[in-house]
């Protein structure tokens, strides 16, 4: 497995397996929403009212509607993760603002 996919595949697979609604932002700013039906090395099949094949090179960000556990028990790498959910980053920013005002 390529090093770049050691985080990508377990994350996308957890979103697919748990049928988590996602927002996918493309590099041109368009927001797509749906559930990940399938994916491979180059594309993600996103299902909403219709299925769309979205090329990964056009994707900027994948945002799950809720936190997911994406650690793979059979992966050869470490179980620690550098991935942070969007809400955590927002909370950290709000905490910093609060601390600065005190």
Curated annotation (Swiss-Prot):
Q: Which InterPro entries match?
A: Hfq, LSM_dom_sf, Sm
Output this protein's name. RNA-binding protein Hfq
Keyword RNA-binding present in the record's keywords: the answer is: yes
Lineage runs:
Bacteria, Pseudomonadati, Pseudomonadota, Gammaproteobacteria, Enterobacterales
Record-linked Pfam families: Hfq
Keywords of the record: RNA-binding, Stress response
Q: Where is this region: Disordered?
A: 63-102
Role played: RNA chaperone that binds small regulatory RNA (sRNAs) and mRNAs to facilitate mRNA translational regulation in response to envelope stress, environmental stress and changes in metabolite concentrations. Also binds with high specificity to tRNAs.
Q: Which CDD domains match?
A: Hfq
User: What Gene Ontology terms describe where this protein resides (cellular component)?
Assistant: cytosol
Family as reported in the entry's similarity comment: Belongs to the Hfq family.
Q: Where is the composition biased (Polar residues)?
A: 70-96
């Amino acid at each position: 497995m390529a090093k770049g996919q050691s985080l990508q595949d377990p994350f996308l697979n957890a979103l697919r397996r748990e049928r988590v609604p996602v927002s996918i932002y493309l590099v041109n700013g368009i927001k797509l929403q749906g559930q990940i039906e399938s994916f491979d090395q180059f594309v993600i099949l996103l299902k909403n009212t219709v299925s769309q094949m979205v090329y990964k090179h056009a994707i900027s960000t994948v945002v799950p509607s809720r936190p997911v556990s994406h650690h793979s028990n059979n992966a050869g790498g470490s179980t620690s993760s550098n991935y942070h959910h969007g809400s955590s980053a927002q909370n950290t920013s709000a905490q910093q603002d609060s601390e600065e005002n005190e």
